[in-house]
Amino acid sequence: MTTVLLPRSLLALFPGVDRRHEVAPGTVGSVIAELDASVPGIRDRLVQAGPRLRPHINVFVDGEPADLATQCAEASVVHVIPAVSGGA
């Protein structure tokens, strides 16, 4: 199974949802679709029309930058990382 790790900032929008999820391997797009089946509404937070990842969302598969077409292997780890902004 492919492991998906969600950021705490996203978990705050979905109370009770675990940070770690195991899903079937496939493209990042299919991984997000499967994740949305168990966490309804999460796809809308990650993907915009096109479809493509929202500008403030970064996805890494096995440490490499990814988009919706990136393939995830059986043992892949997918990190969803929101952009961080702010100033001093």
Go through each PLM region and give its residues:
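Ubiquitin-like/PB1-type beta-grasp interaction modules and other compact soluble beta-rich domains
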Residues: 1-88
